[in-house]
């Protein structure tokens, strides 16, 4: 393959990201997710001539992994959970900094960040074990089912959420987010090593 499909996919992703970013810039403030998407796709497109040997076979996998990175990074100290930038419009501004509101969104953001990192890990695993491609793909996409159910149902568990200490939980969430970021970095390095050595694909 000449990699043209990968280049076109990146260009389409950049165009979509730029459209969303521009719309949000006009009518509101772009979220960290939208800014990061624009930056990542711009960077990858600019570097395509030098990275095509890596991105052509691994672009989808790396994109999924780094989607997880974007989500997990918003759990780190000084950041606001990514999902809160979208869910806050359902509530009055006075609640946007409420500890319970931020706790719920930290749970959902952490969960989705890990879902994307795990999906990327299943891609790498499948590349190393072609005979497992089908079952691993089933597990990879199957993760979306419980994640979607939790996203819908967890915010409704008001009684359980009130028993949680948001301050203590924040430290655990940040630790788990850090582990996810380390895992994502390791998986990215693995795809680069696989490209350089010619193994897997």
Where are these regions (language model features)?
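Membrane-interface helix caps and helix-loop-helix hairpins in membrane proteins
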Residues: 26-30, 49-57, 130-134
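Membrane-proximal helix-loop-helix units in multi-pass membrane proteins
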Residues: 51-104
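Cytoplasmic-side transmembrane-helix entry/capping segments in multi-pass membrane proteins
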Residues: 29-42, 57-66
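Alpha-helical transmembrane segments and their membrane-interface junctions
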Residues: 113-131, 187-200
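Alpha-helical transmembrane segments and their immediate juxtamembrane interface regions
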Residues: 132-172
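C-terminal ends of transmembrane helices
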Residues: 17-29, 151
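Membrane-helix boundary/juxtamembrane motif in polytopic membrane proteins
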Residues: 90-114, 132, 162-175
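Structural signature of hydrophobic alpha-helical transmembrane segments
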Residues: 2-15
